[in-house]
């Protein structure tokens, strides 16, 4: 039996965000998974935030360290994606402190 990857909370995945509209992050890029394994496995969906190497110093950026390239997670661009259909693959894992900071910044937006 072939083991298939299922994203888990805190995973850094590589995924295709196209198609997009307006100022949404587009193209193949990393994203931080926010939803737990059980939800992601059952639904084929996951909540995530896209990442970019182009930091602009916005208050909702979270710096990610220990990855292949320096970058930031965009905590104000939470997305629900069909990770199976978009061919998500695991790229790494973010530090627990970084995941908590992303969640804290999202909480500021949604209260």
Swiss-Prot record:
<dbReference type="GO" id="GO:0040008">
    <property type="term" value="P:regulation of growth"/>
</dbReference>
<keyword id="KW-0540">Nuclease</keyword>
<protein>
    <recommendedName>
        <fullName>Endoribonuclease toxin MazF</fullName>
        <ecNumber>3.1.27.-</ecNumber>
    </recommendedName>
</protein>
<dbReference type="GO" id="GO:0003677">
    <property type="term" value="F:DNA binding"/>
</dbReference>
<dbReference type="Pfam" id="PF02452">
    <property type="entry name" value="PemK_toxin"/>
</dbReference>
<dbReference type="GO" id="GO:0006355">
    <property type="term" value="P:regulation of DNA-templated transcription"/>
</dbReference>
<feature type="region of interest" description="Loop 2, involved in substrate recognition">
    <location>
        <begin position="53"/>
        <end position="61"/>
    </location>
</feature>
<dbReference type="GO" id="GO:0032991">
    <property type="term" value="C:protein-containing complex"/>
</dbReference>
<dbReference type="GO" id="GO:0006417">
    <property type="term" value="P:regulation of translation"/>
</dbReference>
<keyword id="KW-0255">Endonuclease</keyword>
<keyword id="KW-0346">Stress response</keyword>
<dbReference type="GO" id="GO:0003723">
    <property type="term" value="F:RNA binding"/>
</dbReference>
<keyword id="KW-0013">ADP-ribosylation</keyword>
<comment type="function">
    <text>Toxic component of a type II toxin-antitoxin (TA) system. A sequence-specific endoribonuclease it inhibits protein synthesis by cleaving mRNA and inducing bacterial stasis. It is stable, single-strand specific with mRNA cleavage independent of the ribosome, although translation enhances cleavage for some mRNAs. Cleavage occurs at the 5'-end of ACA sequences, yielding a 2',3'-cyclic phosphate and a free 5'-OH, although cleavage can also occur on the 3'-end of the first A.</text>
</comment>
<dbReference type="GO" id="GO:0044010">
    <property type="term" value="P:single-species biofilm formation"/>
</dbReference>
<dbReference type="GO" id="GO:0140677">
    <property type="term" value="F:molecular function activator activity"/>
</dbReference>
<keyword id="KW-0673">Quorum sensing</keyword>
<dbReference type="InterPro" id="IPR003477">
    <property type="entry name" value="PemK-like"/>
</dbReference>
<keyword id="KW-0678">Repressor</keyword>
<feature type="modified residue" description="ADP-ribosylarginine">
    <location>
        <position position="4"/>
    </location>
</feature>
<dbReference type="GO" id="GO:0004521">
    <property type="term" value="F:RNA endonuclease activity"/>
</dbReference>
<comment type="similarity">
    <text>Belongs to the PemK/MazF family.</text>
</comment>
<keyword id="KW-0238">DNA-binding</keyword>
<keyword id="KW-0694">RNA-binding</keyword>
<dbReference type="GO" id="GO:0110001">
    <property type="term" value="C:toxin-antitoxin complex"/>
</dbReference>
<comment type="subunit">
    <text>Probably a dimer. Forms a heterohexamer composed of alternating toxin and antitoxin homodimers MazF(2)-MazE(2)-MazF(2). The binding site of MazE and ssRNA or ssDNA are largely overlapping; the presence of only 1 MazE molecule inhibits mRNA endoribonuclease activity. Binds to EDF but not a mutated EDF (NNGNN).</text>
</comment>
<dbReference type="GO" id="GO:0016075">
    <property type="term" value="P:rRNA catabolic process"/>
</dbReference>
<keyword id="KW-0378">Hydrolase</keyword>
<dbReference type="InterPro" id="IPR011067">
    <property type="entry name" value="Plasmid_toxin/cell-grow_inhib"/>
</dbReference>
<dbReference type="GO" id="GO:0030308">
    <property type="term" value="P:negative regulation of cell growth"/>
</dbReference>
<dbReference type="GO" id="GO:0009372">
    <property type="term" value="P:quorum sensing"/>
</dbReference>
<dbReference type="GO" id="GO:0051607">
    <property type="term" value="P:defense response to virus"/>
</dbReference>
<keyword id="KW-1277">Toxin-antitoxin system</keyword>
<comment type="function">
    <text>Might also serve to protect cells against bacteriophage; in the presence of MazE-MazF fewer P1 phages are produced than in a disrupted strain. For strain K38 most wild-type cells are killed but not by phage lysis; it was suggested that MazE-MazF causes P1 phage exclusion from the bacterial population. This phenomenon is strain dependent.</text>
</comment>
<dbReference type="GO" id="GO:0006402">
    <property type="term" value="P:mRNA catabolic process"/>
</dbReference>
<dbReference type="GO" id="GO:0044877">
    <property type="term" value="F:protein-containing complex binding"/>
</dbReference>
<dbReference type="GO" id="GO:0042803">
    <property type="term" value="F:protein homodimerization activity"/>
</dbReference>
<dbReference type="GO" id="GO:0043068">
    <property type="term" value="P:positive regulation of programmed cell death"/>
</dbReference>
<keyword id="KW-0804">Transcription</keyword>
<keyword id="KW-0051">Antiviral defense</keyword>
<feature type="region of interest" description="Loop 1, participates in catalytic activity">
    <location>
        <begin position="17"/>
        <end position="28"/>
    </location>
</feature>
<keyword id="KW-0810">Translation regulation</keyword>
């Amino acid at each position: 039996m072939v083991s298939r990857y299922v994203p888990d909370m805190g995973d850094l995945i590589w995924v295709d965000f196209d198609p997009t509209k307006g100022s949404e992050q587009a193209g193949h890029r990393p994203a931080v998974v926010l939803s737990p394994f059980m939800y992601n496995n059952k639904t084929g969906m996951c909540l995530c935030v896209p990442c970019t190497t182009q930091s602009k110093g916005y208050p909702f950026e979270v710096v990610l360290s220990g990855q292949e390239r320096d970058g930031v997670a965009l905590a104000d661009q939470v997305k629900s994606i069909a990770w199976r259909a978009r061919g998500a693959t695991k790229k790494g894992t973010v530090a627990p402190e970084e995941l908590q900071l992303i969640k804290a910044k999202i909480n500021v937006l949604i209260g």
